[in-house]
Amino acid sequence: MSQSAFFKFSYNKLHHHIPLLFPNYLSIAPPLLRTTAAVRSNAAPDPPLGFLGAADVIVVGAGVAGSALAYTLAKDGRRVHVIERDLREPDRIVGELLQPGGYLKLIELGLEDCVDQIDAQRVLGYVLFMDGKKTKLPYPLEKFHAEVAGRSFHNGRFVQMMREKAAALQFVRMEQGTVTSLLEQDNKNVVGVQYRTKDGQQLKAYAPLTVICDGCFSNLRRSLCHPKAQFGDVMKSGRFDLSVCTSLLESPNMFLATCQVEVPSSFVGLVLENCQLPFENYGHVILADPSPILFYRISSTEVRCLVDIPGPKVPLVRSGMANYLKATVASQIPPELKDAFLSAIDRGNIRIMPNSSMPAEPYHTPGALLIGDAFNMRHPLTGGGMTVALSDIVLLRDLIKPVGDLNDASSLCRYLESFYILRKPMASTINTLAGALYKVFSVSPDDARKELRQACFDYLSLGKIFSGGPIALLSGLNPYPLSLVLHFFAVAFYGVGRLLLPFPSFERMWVGARIVLCAFGIIFPIIKAEGIRQMFLPTSIPAFYRAPPLR
């Protein structure tokens, strides 16, 4: 046996037996053992290695967020072990439009070439259609380089390019497997993950920091929320009786630690082939009844159509979906796209995706971090998800870069509390705008909501700052929550002014008052969920000023 083979054999045996003989070894072992890459629960062949030895960071999920994080941390010299459930090319109907603000973050990460060879299409803004009228809303890109614009593409092609670029780095080990649970030390610190490989073997992986970014259907989200901690505290107190059960039912956030996912609607996805958009290089938003319809190009020959269906129930694809699309939706499609839309329905391949929304409610867990859609979701109407995720990756990279030793979990956790505050300008602006616009653009029988919807379209049609300001917010180019609130209420008061002029009446004054109340009722719950203080007064929070732990 060669010297290298003997060392590898001894290394694997050592890490197999130490946990069995000394269950608490993680608390006393040196950093190399605490961050061991894999402790085998049975005799299994080694996974493909991008590097030998211990990992500094485990990344769960290799989507947009996970791949970008692995790449940027590895470029900084961190050893990253990526565990992804399925390394085949994803086939999704969302995550296909990257806003200009997100493209700027790609440039910061050095990943802008990932959109160069996938037939990605430049996006220069939006066109709104409503009741036979249309208005063009270009992105305010005058101050940026000519290459800066939005991009639309096949999500799977984009993700595969990012995975390939990350996996090519020496310090990235990318492995296919399903993470089933987080490994905890003393029910306090997360020290790694347990996962199942594609051939069914159960393995454990250890690292000082585990970053969960396994998407909107994350099965680890609740693990970081620790609902059993709340429940366990009640059990230990001896006060578990009927009144406690009632309070848990009445206040589920206490039990579920605020990890609630709302599904306000679903997208029905189609691909239109070999057709021309009325305005090339623009996203098309039809303000239809009952809710918006989107069109945007995802390749030189394909146009994505997303039909929003509000509520938790949608017609079944096999029985009623085609009839619904032809009877209810087709008549509201622009004439230039109607034939291609009907042809796409006849071809089949109709896809449905629930539109999830979840405000970010962090539970600070030493050794673990939640990012991407696993951490924070908003309605995909505005296409802001990837922009928020990439912005978070840039911020997290900059925060971790000066940290020399990741093994001090409690100090690192306390320092990374600043992440949740510093991300708020970009994330809360896009999240709030997405939720508010969806509610404003959806049809309602209420007169005040109808007036607010019409006022929003007419306000954006004014052009200049009235369209440029909101579009800069939506695109991630101007992440200022206060600017968002000012524009939103400017729309409301614009609607009131139109209603009262030239001759106000008592009835119109009443509707005008209800418009303002309606606007407040739409935006305030979203802002409250995001955190009023975090959005508008982040510098008043001590975590904003956290310094990195001493080396």
Could you tell me what each predicted segment is?
Residues 24, 398-551:
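C-terminal helical "tail/cap" subdomain of flavin- and related membrane-associated enzymes
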Residues 35-36, 246, 313-420:
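FAD/FMN-dependent oxidoreductases across multiple families
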Residues 61-66, 215, 372, 385:
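Conserved phosphate-binding and hydrolysis motifs of nucleotide-dependent enzymes
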Residues 52-54, 104, 113-235, 249-254, ...:
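Conserved N-terminal helical subregion
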Residues 82-83, 212, 371:
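Generic enzyme active-site microenvironment
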Residues 194-364:
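Conserved FAD-binding catalytic core of PHBH/FMO-like flavoproteins
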Residues 1-57, 72-76, 547:
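Extreme N-terminal leader/targeting segments of oxidoreductases
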